[in-house]
Amino acid sequence: MASPALAAALAAAAAEGPNGSDAGEWGSGGGANASGTDWGPPPGQYSAGAVAGLAAVVGFLIVFTVVGNVLVVIAVLTSRALRAPQNLFLVSLASADILVATLVMPFSLANELMAYWYFGQVWCGVYLALDVLFCTSSIVHLCAISLDRYWSVTQAVEYNLKRTPRRVKATIVAVWLISAVISFPPLVSFYRRPDGAAYPQCGLNDETWYILSSCIGSFFAPCLIMGLVYARIYRVAKLRTRTLSEKRGPAGPDGASPTTENGLGKAAGENGHCAPPRTEVEPDESSAAERRRRRGALRRGGRRREGAEGDTGSADGPGPGLAAEQGARTASRSPGPGGRLSRASSRSVEFFLSRRRRARSSVCRRKVAQAREKRFTFVLAVVMGVFVLCWFPFFFSYSLYGICREACQLPEPLFKFFFWIGYCNSSLNPVIYTVFNQDFRRSFKHILFRRRRRGFRQ
């Protein structure tokens, strides 16, 4: 692993000073402090072993974050089961996490291990803005996803027609613009230690107005919106479940689950797979009588044809539905007089059967889509919950410091721990998708092991 080399590079940079010269050189300033004296030795706060250990842990976290989120992007863009327009939100969210791992975390690690900012004044402002931007974009993405879930639950048909890839992409652009507006202030008002400080530091604006406004805009307000939206989704889902259970009624005497009004078993709405109908439930009595009349005519025509051909098959068929279908196919193929007599009725039955199969297939697809939406909503609820758990300690302690300053300030090691726990969230979303979503799990396996299978075949 490259952690010893990284630790050595950090130690060399600390000894060399910022920007490759004296430790005191910063922006337009010189290589000494205001009094003209040298800065002295770098303020190293970790031993060489601790530097190597922390670099190894954070390096693994960075690699894991990048690889996991790249897999998410590839899975959504290549898997047929994940190609729904709303999954573009996950692509954008994964992209934000990749940018956190590549553009923010390495510099945060260097700043932590070296105990001062080595990379100059301009990059300090850019780094702070990117840090706030990517964190804010993550939670604004989750907020937009929660609204998407709410509309897909409460306005399923209308909203699904409107939710095109173009609309989703426009929403994603709006999410990034909102995040940029919230994160722009660090570019123009980042905080810098006074000249009397030992080494240059890079930190966010320390004024109370900025601390509170950034915490509210970047975390607390989106969290409130997500909480209210998901509470509403839960209420709607609970009401629908109660209504469906009342319509279905109790289970049959044999303990079997009741069949829905479209002839599909209950499993179709729960696990996303269409179960074959246990019984044929007709929409109304008149259409059922009409079908029985057609089947009777078909059987009579089939018997006449069988008598003409000398067939001695059994009169007991496998069931009215199957007998009708088989009779229709046989009659349509038969050139005999019995086939001609029953051709009109066989065509009508074949038309009815094909229409019923299409209707059943349509209902099946709708049930599968609803089950997928349900699972997707649950997975995203887990993603949002984990995000809040990871970032709440940092934002709460940071806003508390903005209100009452030193009286409420946490010990510095604990505050830094909360800070890095927030960064860890960027690596958790792929794990959540793998654990809770079968489509992602299957797609990840296909991506990771496809080449290995090809190698074995060759």
UniProtKB/Swiss-Prot annotation:
Q: Cellular component GO terms, alphabetically?
A: axon; axon terminus; cytoplasm; glutamatergic synapse; neuronal cell body; plasma membrane; postsynaptic density membrane; postsynaptic membrane
Q: Where is this site: Implicated in ligand binding?
A: 131
* SS bond partners: 124-202
Q: Provide the membrane-side ranges marked Extracellular in the record.
A: 1-51, 115-124, 192-207, 404-416
The biological process GO terms on file are: adrenergic receptor signaling pathway; female pregnancy; G protein-coupled receptor signaling pathway; negative regulation of uterine smooth muscle contraction; platelet activation; positive regulation of MAPK cascade; positive regulation of neuron differentiation; positive regulation of vasoconstriction
Function of the molecule: Alpha-2 adrenergic receptors mediate the catecholamine-induced inhibition of adenylate cyclase through the action of G proteins.
Q: What is this protein called?
A: Alpha-2C adrenergic receptor
The species is Rattus norvegicus
Per the record, the gene is: Adra2c
